[in-house]
Amino acid sequence: MRIALDAMGGDRAPQVVVAGAAAAAREGVEVLLVGDEAQVRAELARLGADLPVWHAPDHIRMEEAATEVRRRPQASVRVAMELLKRGEVQAVVSMGHSGATLAAALLVLGRVKGVERPALLVEFPSLRGRTFLLDGGANADCRPSFLVQFAAMGLAYAEASGALAPRVGLLSIGEEEGKGNALVQEAYPLLRAALGERFYGNVEGRDIFLGTTEVVVTDGFTGNVALKLAEGEARVLLTWIKEALTSSFRARLGALLVREALARVKARVDPAQYGAMPLLGVEGAVFIGHGSADALAVKNALLRAKAMVEAGLLARVRQRLSALHV
């Protein structure tokens, strides 16, 4: 199995991206770097690594419009999608322009049957392990039917990740049926009819971290706000802990005793540990990461893509969508 990595995608590409690819290759991932061959090979030489490169002379910059991918067939992310469509790779990972990656996936791969809009799945750490939220930002405005499809795809991903009998919660401002805006109120009966016992009902923001359900569905605007809020809060809490543990000589002594435990906590809330978000609902395995990703995040994105392809994620998504009871 081979994964195409957009070597030109990200704030610090190709340096960080190539470094992450080299690290993933050492852990058994077969990576094909797609990008400007001269730049990519220069980075490989600097690292003393030997990975295959597919030349793509163009790339979509962060400040450019996502629609640019339509008129630039030699852009690295579009070339990677073409390789996926032809079966020369089994997944695509990009840490670059998320809008351009979404546009390229829709343009080249198309949607899975039964999907009106693809969704980004975001993984949150929780007291029970992890919670998968859709949509993480691909669709700011949603119809109720979109949330039903998000739920089916989220269940497929949770099952591919090893969850047993996962359930879906609908993000709202109260647990009771009837709470929430028009979208939530209209989606509730559709989810109940489509999912049966797999639908838990309404959940609140805190339930994402409590792990009340394995999957949470919402519109992409709300989902992205939740993601950025969680990232900011994690950063603030870690900063406060660091300040408290370095505030005095006694505190620094105490810090030595809990150093390993704190390192484990930090790892659980570090976005780099999750690598990239899967774009569910397109005809192929596509993963989109942070533009600010470091080499660890790139490596973990590739490892996640490999694991999900091996778990048959796309087939699971198709099956879940075809089994909807509506």
Swiss-Prot record:
Reactions catalysed, as given in the entry: a fatty acyl-[ACP] + phosphate = an acyl phosphate + holo-[ACP]
Database matches in HAMAP family: PlsX
One GO term of the biological process aspect: fatty acid biosynthetic process
Keyword Cytoplasm attached: yes
GO cellular component, one term: cytoplasm
Identification of the protein by name: Phosphate acyltransferase
Assembly and oligomerization: Homodimer. Probably interacts with PlsY.
Localisation per UniProt entry: Cytoplasm
Pathway membership: Lipid metabolism; phospholipid metabolism
Keyword Transferase: yes
Protein task: Catalyzes the reversible formation of acyl-phosphate (acyl-PO(4)) from acyl-[acyl-carrier-protein] (acyl-ACP). This enzyme utilizes acyl-ACP as fatty acyl donor, but not acyl-CoA.
EC number, as in UniProt: 2.3.1.274
Signal peptide extent: none
Gene Ontology MF terms: phosphate:acyl-[acyl carrier protein] acyltransferase activity
Enzyme class label: transferase
Family: Belongs to the PlsX family.
Keywords for this protein: Cytoplasm, Lipid biosynthesis, Lipid metabolism, Phospholipid biosynthesis, Phospholipid metabolism, Transferase
